[in-house]
């Protein structure tokens, strides 16, 4: 039996390297996914998200200054990216020091800047600070904040630079000064960084029988409702749980839609299908990007979903996280059409990456952990580790 398992696993891994057309989700549940998101520059003094920097919905609270001699100094890593210009006024290399998360985001932004303006590079004017030039709780003291410009110092570009920083995954972006853009990130050890994409156990799904059931009671093999590419209701089988932990406390984004009796709770890096004022259709979008006025797709009654405007977005903590995966990669949670996936802002890519698990669902009993075990599924953990190095510019 062990030999059989090894062979099966080898075949599954090999399939990831083969472009199998039938493994993809086709056009997806909401039409074609190839729209390019229109990038809208930030206005002077605008910040995204529209909450204070040190709140849960943004970069989170300060954890205290980091000094060269402190134990936490090892949390800072140097950034020698040749595509970034560091001003380094102090001539100490301090501006190159930052947290791992900040480094990932600024490296992603550097690529976006060169793609947007050929011949122009990203310029960091202020990074980690050890001289006390900022407010006492500034994230600059922790290597979690940067002040940035473009290498040509063209202030007409700064609004778009701020937008690119938002797209690169910075947790808070502020067009703070006409001389620079301020960006910051969550702490590397924060719950918002480490947690996967999930729903609370109290979230309700509609079963194929028509009854409603909380996710905490959902079982592998159950049939739930989702939609096809036209928005018509269809049923889909629950294949496994990508993440299941009834004891874990997580911060959820609470989304309330106009005329919809239920409220959706979802972790910040889970994918929802959203139409914003700057997009041409419904696109897979991280939950933390959702804003009032965006459109979601909801089910009220009848045989299909309808568009509804988001009227409220807030944060709420609950205990219990659940992430079921269906054969279609989508499902209705509390009446809102959602993706089963998180972490990478591409529903199609996530769906294709998990194709081996869907193809081999008939022999699931021969693979490890394809049951109701708690925690993150082993296959997803491997993909997440690989994605950190291959697709880091699209990850929260």
From Swiss-Prot:
Signal peptide: 1-22
Keyword Calcium applies: yes
Amino-acid positions noted as binding Ca(2+) 2 in the UniProt annotation, renumbered to this chain: 90, 126, 129, 131
Entry-linked Gene3D superfamilies: 3.30.1380.10, Hedgehog/Intein (Hint) domain
Enzyme class: hydrolase
Pfam families: HH_signal (PF01085), Hint (PF01079)
EC number annotated for this UniProt entry: 3.1.-.-
Keyword Secreted: yes
Positions annotated to bind Ca(2+) 1: 89-90, 95, 125-126
Residues binding Zn(2+), per UniProt: 140, 147, 182
Record-level Gene Ontology MF annotations: calcium ion binding; cholesterol-protein transferase activity; patched binding; peptidase activity
SMART domains: HintC (SM00305), HintN (SM00306)
Similarity comment: family membership: Belongs to the hedgehog family.
Protein name, per record: Desert hedgehog protein A
Organism of provenance: Xenopus laevis
